[in-house]
Design a protein with these regions (language model features):
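Cofactor-pocket helix-loop regions in the catalytic cores of large enzyme subunits
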Residues: 1-161, 175, 184-324
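A contiguous, basic/glycine-rich beta-loop/short-helix subdomain that forms a polymer-engagement track
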Residues: 141, 166-167
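Long, His/Glu/Asp-enriched segments that create or flank divalent metal/ion-associated functional microenvironments
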Residues: 170
């Protein structure tokens, strides 16, 4: 949080100075660990047994929110049976974190209510990233730390405008404003005067699967180095090799472009374009270009509009970001 999200990191430090308890889970001795009540340093790749061991402790010591579980949680008995195998002692063997330290963290999270969790790319950009987040959700459900002030599972996105991009609908399952395709279709069709797809598109992992099976033929990567960033490098590279055509649009000749790209489109930096950013707390900040784009580079929106018009697309006659 302190390295990639300095504002949130500062808020966390301020909360600790005002009496909040802090658990840090990171193999490294990061700056935020200096403020931690408990610092767990698991062996890389062992997030799941560690978090499940915390859940085991909360269930075993009956630190869970009984009323919340009874009213809001399903599959309680199967979960209790499942979690029995993840004792702190068994996790100690995998994670290289002492069982007592795991118990201390679990007790602290369960009793210092309200509690919230923050996780970054160390959890999500992982071969078991989805399962890791599910473990965090389980901890929140066990303790009733969802849906109330000071609670929740808070993902810290990788770059400064991922939140804004998602909110604008850069996700196969949602429309602008983070409205689902099914719920928002009637309203958006009436406002846009155009049809909205009945079926959502593929997410990145589904695209990789579709590429490997030959269902996906081409890919356009904008500001994202797929080859270097995706968790399963071997499978990702195999999928990229299976594609017939790859466009890479970025500031730099990244690994995806260098190894697999068919066409490279140079994009302008954030210092060379107008626009907005939305941070993690959904605060919108306007950005003004400090200089003109260098060389042949252009702002992303302009490249997209020019290609769309060349393909005969309608609705791409924008002249500046404000008009968009």
């Amino acid at each position: 949080a302190t390295e990639n999200h300095p504002i949130i990191g500062a808020r966390i430090k301020q909360a600790v100075l005002e009496g909040a308890k802090l658990i840090v889970i990171d193999p490294r001795r990061i700056e935020l660990a200096e403020y931690a009540t408990v610092h767990l340093q698991p062996k890389p790749g062992t997030n799941i047994p560690l978090l499940n061991a915390m859940a085991h402790t909360i269930v075993q010591e009956q630190l869970f929110d009984r009323r919340f579980v009874e009213e809001r949680v399903t599959e309680w008995n199967p979960f209790c049976d499942f979690i029995k195998q993840f004792s702190p002692e068994s996790a100690e063997e995998f994670c290289h974190v002492s069982a007592e330290l795991i118990r201390e963290a679990a007790r602290l999270y369960a009793t210092a209510r309200p509690s919230m969790s923050f996780h970054g790319l160390g959890v999500t950009e992982h071969t078991q990233g989805t399962e890791g987040v599910m473990c965090l959700v389980n901890l929140a459900l066990l303790t009733g730390n969802i849906g109330k002030p000071g609670t929740g599972i808070n993902p810290l996105r990788g770059q400064n405008n991922v939140q804004g991009a998602a909110h604008m609908g850069c996700d196969p399952g949602i429309l602008t404003g983070s409205v689902s395709l099914n719920d928002g279709r009637p309203l958006f069709e009436s406002v846009w005067g155009a049809s909205v797809p009945r079926k959502q598109g593929l997410n990145l992992l589904e695209m990789m699967d579709a590429a490997e099976t030959g269902k996906l033929k081409a890919l356009w990567a904008i500001g994202y180095d797929i080859a270097l960033t995706n968790a399963n490098t071997t499978a990702t590279n195999q999928a990229l090799r299976s594609l017939e055509f790859i466009i890479v649009q970025d500031m730099f000749m990244n690994e995806t472009a260098r190894q697999f790209g068919s066409v490279f489109l140079p994009a302008a930096s954030s210092f060379e374009r107008d626009g907005t950013f939305m941070n993690a707390e959904r605060r919108i900040q306007r950005v003004r270009a400090a200089l003109r784009p260098l060389g042949a580079s252009k702002p992303d929106w302009q490249i997209i509009c020019e290609i769309a018009r060349a393909l005969g697309g309608r609705g791409f006659g924008f002249t500046d970001p404000e008009e968009i």
